[in-house]
């Protein structure tokens, strides 16, 4: 329900759950809920992994240590199999991306009404709890990856090497420089755009389905009982989706940075 306590129509209910808590206008609009949840989950990730690292023992590890070690080993193996350059920062970066994106995605598992209704009782009119359903968050993550691609491309190949890569590929002839530049520029720019839109699209669609299922509880008992079955089924399937999307974002980041380290 809205902060005013008025009953919402189905359309209003959907719109309410898909609206961010914002301040400012236009380009300078800040989505406070997305910022708080994304930063908060990032801090939680750092605290958990730092605590486990400090308390790690060579003896019989606890369940949390085993779980963290399993994730670290999985990410480390993924980096070793995919990244062919030498850079000690890639594995920690991949670990951060995988766990952080997964944690933001996992907020989609929280029942859609719990936190927004709690916020409404505290006088907060809107609360969108899944940061990766906000284009600002997914594009910010993708922009960070894009800047790293540019940085390492120039660092490994030099400015001249990077320019040659943009102007002399795929057709190695001076007359084809404009065509090469156009093709390579589109390819380069498409990387962060595809990263951002893929993550956003999958999580936004998943959130919308949860909201539509939640609407079924307001109907008669037969439809409400069907909603319970649908919600359970979608919940199980969506666990795979949120994990897969975090994995894809991580793997594409590794692949793009590996390509940036290749000196032709």
UniProtKB/Swiss-Prot annotation:
Per its record, what are the GO molecular function terms?
proton-transporting ATP synthase activity, rotational mechanism
Recorded GO cellular component terms are: plasma membrane; proton-transporting ATP synthase complex
Classify the protein's membrane topology as the record does: Multi-pass membrane protein
Q: Where are the transmembrane segments?
A: 29-49, 87-107, 134-154, 177-197, 208-228, 235-255
InterPro entries hit by this protein: ATP_syn_F0_a_bact/chloroplast (IPR045082), ATP_synth_F0_asu (IPR000568), ATP_synth_F0_asu_AS (IPR023011), F0_ATP_A_sf (IPR035908)
Q: What does this protein do?
A: Key component of the proton channel; it plays a direct role in the translocation of protons across the membrane.
- Designated name of the protein: ATP synthase subunit a
Q: Which organism is it from?
A: Shewanella amazonensis (strain ATCC BAA-1098 / SB2B)
């Amino acid at each position: 329900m809205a902060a005013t306590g008025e009953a919402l129509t189905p359309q209003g209910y959907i719109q309410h759950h898909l609206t961010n808590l914002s301040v400012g206008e236009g380009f300078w609009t800040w989505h406070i809920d997305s910022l708080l949840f994304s930063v908060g989950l990032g801090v939680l990730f750092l605290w958990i992994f730092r605590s486990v690292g400090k308390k790690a023992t060579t003896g019989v590890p606890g369940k949390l240590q085993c779980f963290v070690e399993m994730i670290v080993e999985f990410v480390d193996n993924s980096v070793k199999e995919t990244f062919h350059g030498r850079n000690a920062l890639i594995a920690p970066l991949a670990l951060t991306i995988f766990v952080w994106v997964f944690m933001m995605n996992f907020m989609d598992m929280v029942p859609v009404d719990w936190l927004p209704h709690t916020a409404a009782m505290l006088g907060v009119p809107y609360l969108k709890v899944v940061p990766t359903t906000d284009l600002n968050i997914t594009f910010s993550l993708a922009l960070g990856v894009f800047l790293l691609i540019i940085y390492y491309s120039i660092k490994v190949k030099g400015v001249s090497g990077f320019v040659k890569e943009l102007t002399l590929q795929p057709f190695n002839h001076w007359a084809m420089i404009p065509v090469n530049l156009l093709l390579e520029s589109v390819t380069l720019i498409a990387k962060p755009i595809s990263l951002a839109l893929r993550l956003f699209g999958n999580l936004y669609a998943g959130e919308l389905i949860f909201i539509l299922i939640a609407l079924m509880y307001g109907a008669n008992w037969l439809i409400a009982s069907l909603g319970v079955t649908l919600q359970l089924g979608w919940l199980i399937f969506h666990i795979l989706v949120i994990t897969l999307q975090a994995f894809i974002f991580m793997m594409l980041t590794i692949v793009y940075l590996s390509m940036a380290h290749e000196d032709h």
